[in-house]
Each structure stands twice: as structure tokens, then as C-alpha cells.
Amino acid sequence: MKTPILLHIPHSSLSIPKTVRDKLCISEAELERELLRMTDRYTDILFDLPTITNHSIIYPVSRLVVDPERFEDDEKEPMAAVGMGVIYTATSQKTLLRTQPDVCERTELLDAYYHPHHRRFTEAVAELLNDAGQALIIDCHCFASRPLPYELNQGMDRPDICLGTDAFHTPKWLLDSVREAFLKLGYSVAINHPFAGTIVPMAYYQQEPRVRSIMIEINRKLYMHEDTGEKGPLFARVKDDIATVASQIVQT
């Protein structure tokens, strides 16, 4: 039986509601630059794989509003130490983005964006488990070719492809299959470098082995001009190669 795939695309949106924009301390020009740095631009297009799966969860607003891939509790979120918990107060350059929201605003933001996203995510996984008895999440991201100041890993040796894993939810066969598929296409591949881990709904995390997950991060230099955000000449090829890799996962 083919493996049912769910695409999780959390950081592709550029949308910032006016009520949130009004809280930001940076100019329009600075905001445009920050969106260019922090958005996983075009991942919703690169990972649009209609011949392989029609199951996808795409976060509708920018991560600068609320980041769905952070722990809700800042005490559990390592990035909160640099002002990038679930609600960012710092920019990628370690300057002020906004003041810390009060309890009321924080609750409103989480209820408006974070909680609905995770409900949809959990429900989508539950549906696949019910229908197919298993679910494979691909956590879809991209990364800058040079480390941004906020990043914990400042190493310059960045691969074409970064694969993020979880000891419980990423079986060896899955990691090996994805890694070998990208290598055969001519890409350099690193595991959990420069970014580590992969997402699973908390209802299943470390509990349900039928839920598998792997993060695929694409180096932006492969498909876009990082200084402008425009698509690069190899955009179509990278998109096709992602589809090739995903099709092999389905058949594994």
C-alpha cells in the first residue's frame, strides 16, 4: 500500500494582519527585509505535489505574527531566549520587532492562529490514520545560504538539503530513502544541520509509531535570488526534483 503523505508548510506566508502590523516597531522597508529573510518563500509552490498527495496544511499568516513551529510555552522553547518564542519580539538581526504582548493579546493571537492551525494539523493526521492506518508528515522548509544572526548554528558549511529527524518518528528506512534520493539527483545532504528535528502533532508525539515525520529544508540559493526574493533559473528543476523524491517515499 502506498504511504499517505501529509505536507506541513508553516512558514510560506507573507501575510500580516493590520492589527499585528500596528504592533511592530519597524518601518515598512525594514519589514520587507525581515520578511525576505524569515519567510520560507515559495515552499507552498515547491511542495505542491498534486500527483502524489492532496493532503497539506499551510499556515495562513506570516511566522512574524505567531510561529506555529514553536512550543506554546516559552519555558519549553529554546528560541524564546533570543526573542523568538511562539510570538517574536526580536528580528533575525537581534533588534526589536515588537514589545512583549500582554496576557490578553497573547491569548488572542494564539487562539486566532496557533490553536486553529494545530487543530487542523492533528485532525489531518487522525484522518490519515483512520483511513490508511499510517501517516507520513513531510515538514516543508527552506533556509538561507548564509546563517542569519539569530540562528543557533552559525556554521558556514551549509548543504543543498537539510533533513531533520526525530528519534521516535523518523525510521531509518525513511531517512535513508530521502537522503539517497536527493544524493542521486546531485544534491549535497546533511542530517539535522543546520536545523534539526521535525514536527508531529502533540497528541501523537512520542506515542504513535504509525505517525512518521521528516523535515526537508531546501537551500534558498538553489531556487531563488535571496537578495530580491525572485525565483531563480533552476526553480522548476528543484520543484520537479522534490516531486521525484516524494514519489519515491510514497512507493517505499
What are these regions (language model features)?
Residues M1-I137, C142-T252:
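N-terminal catalytic or cofactor-binding beta/alpha core of small enzyme domains
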